[in-house]
Curated annotation (Swiss-Prot):
GO terms for molecular function: small ribosomal subunit rRNA binding; structural constituent of ribosome. SUPFAM superfamilies: Ribosomal protein S20. It comes from Shewanella frigidimarina (strain NCIMB 400). Gene3D superfamilies: Ribosomal protein S20 (1.20.58.110). GO terms for cellular component: cytosol; small ribosomal subunit. The gene is rpsT. This is Small ribosomal subunit protein bS20. Residues 1-27 are annotated as: Disordered. Keywords: Ribonucleoprotein, Ribosomal protein, RNA-binding, rRNA-binding. Disulfide bonds: none annotated. Belongs to the bacterial ribosomal protein bS20 family.
Length: 88
């Protein structure tokens, strides 16, 4: 338990950040799941549209430090490859 005034403040800030990050991480997962659902349905147009919406969100979360930039790149590359496989 935090005892000093500064430690209590840090604990409050950490909790606030944890909740904010959890919300953003949930939002990120939701948009990625929408792309995956569109891919599984086999609808190329819907998958492309969902990916166009999800892509900047993935990038934004990487710049905010919520996910690693390599993970963001890997996620986008894999989703894009699956979308291209539908079209072929």
């Amino acid at each position: 338990m935090a005892n000093s005034k500064s430690a209590k403040k840090r604990a409050l800030q950490s909790e606030k950040r944890r909740q904010h990050n959890a919300s953003r991480r949930s939002m990120l997962r939701t948009y990625v799941k929408r792309v995956i659902a569109a891919i599984k349905s086999g609808d190329h147009k819907a998958a492309t549209e969902a990916f166009a919406i999800a892509q900047p969100i993935v990038d934004r979360m990487a710049t905010k430090g919520l996910i690693h930039k390599n993970k963001a790149g890997r996620q986008k590359a894999r989703l894009n490859a699956k979308i291209k496989a539908i079209a072929a």
